[in-house]
Amino acid sequence: LGKQVIAKFKLDQGKDPQSYGIGIKELWEIDPARHKAGLALHSAGWPLDENTYGGSFLYHMEDNKVVVGFVVGLDYTNPWLSPFEEFQRFKTHPNIRWYFEGDEAKGIAPGKRISYGARAITAGGLLSLPKTVFPGGALVGCDAGYLNASRIKGSHAAIKTGMMAAEAAYDALQAGRSHDELSAYPEAFENSWLHTELNKARNFKQWFKKGRTVGTLMTGVEQFLLRGHI
């Protein structure tokens, strides 16, 4: 629906073309001996090649549950590459499979996959962000493209943009307005910590088009040394 709205109102006019990734996620239940509640792990690259963007996440939830996932940029050039198979290869890494495999000698049971799924994600960042308001409505969260691809994070952005849009809608209703544009919403975004965060990461995908080594180096320089001032 969001893509239809963007096309109908030409909200992406003058913006960089959006780029996408595919995220694959599994929910596991693992042995308590290998569960560390609150542990969060991220990785970039392996098993992907130098010129293919991607990374992973592994989160330890409560009740011995673990969420593990892998994201691959859909601009990869190898026609034989399978994001699903790359995800399965990723889980064979010694530091990752340790959480899922059992050890009969130590009485550790192997993990059990409970559920799985996949979805496309927007990865273009701030430079691909469309106009987020139109007559009578607004775009928030991943539908607009607020994902911070450099950190594989989007939930916090979805919550924040939802709050800002709701506040703008409330003010409009209190003023007796209807079916116009909630201009207060994009204004609030531009003055928020979220805009600052996404602005620092705005060139992330552009750098990684030059390969993982250059992308990692320049992203580090831009985000941590120059604080996005480039």
Protein language model regions, located:
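Residues forming the flavin
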Residues: 1-229
